Amino acid sequence: MKELGCGAVVFPVDYTAPEELIEAYAGAAKKAGLVIAEVGAWCNPVAPAETERRAAMERCIGQLKLADKIGANCCVNIAGSTGSRWDGAYKENFSEEHWEKTVKSIREIIDAAAPVNTYYTIEPMPWMVPKDPEEYERLIAAVDRERFAVHMDLANWITSPEKYFNNEDFMEKRFDKLGSHIKSCHIKDVCLQAEFTFQLKETACGEGILNLEKYARLADRVNPQMPMIIEHLHSDDEYLESIAYLKARLEKAGVRMCN
């Protein structure tokens, strides 16, 4: 990864992996000078089905303990949904009951794992808590745990024409509001589709409208070692192309690019 100009990685195995494999990956990252940006939980700790919910809570606690053990910047998940699809859009996702369950689940995960070297974070989503930066501030206050922080995915918050076309102003205000809490970032792009009605598509970096140079500068201002993780591409070749593109684009703009 260092040869590609990268300075951060996502941890490739979960807490159920053999201890020697976990230690080997963590040791390799440390030897190469790579920041372990995040350990993903990616499950639904507020699932309506009790069996799924219990399994998800167990996984979140295990993943947070793993992140703490290996010194990752954070363990990241989404809040979870009220329906059968773990990351799905449902009306009830905006209910007070769902808010209360989200706060309770985050507290229980952090209290059970008791991290001291890392943070539990929620990746924002367009259709669940936290749906906007103001709600993320409310969530931080409601959870009231020192080891709860922010995972920044700016593209997921571009949900209107105003935010889309004024993305530079939007991202600056978001970093001003949440910057001190941010532990890791996803970097990608967003493109408005021509078809009616209003449709936004997540794209690879450079295929949308976001000012990625400004995004990287704002992240760097918060933390010069802030991980910026590319995601949701379909092959190794696509990732290599995206890394090369982003590195060239940011270097041309005079923006540090080591992640």
Set out the residue ranges of the language-model regions:
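Active-site acidic/histidine proton-transfer and metal-coordination neighborhood
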Residues: 27, 31, 50-150
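Acidic-and-aromatic substrate-binding clefts and catalytic sites of carbohydrate-active enzymes
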Residues: 10-24, 44-54, 83, 126-132, ...
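Short acidic/histidine-rich active-site segments
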Residues: 187, 224-233
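Acidic (Asp/Glu)-rich catalytic clusters
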Residues: 1-3, 18-39, 62-71, 107-115, ...
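Acidic/histidine-rich catalytic cores of soluble enzymes
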Residues: 9, 39, 104-204, 209, ...
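C-terminal helical cap(s) of enzyme catalytic domains, especially alpha/beta-barrels
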Residues: 239-257
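Conserved, mostly hydrophobic/aromatic
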Residues: 1, 29, 56, 67, ...
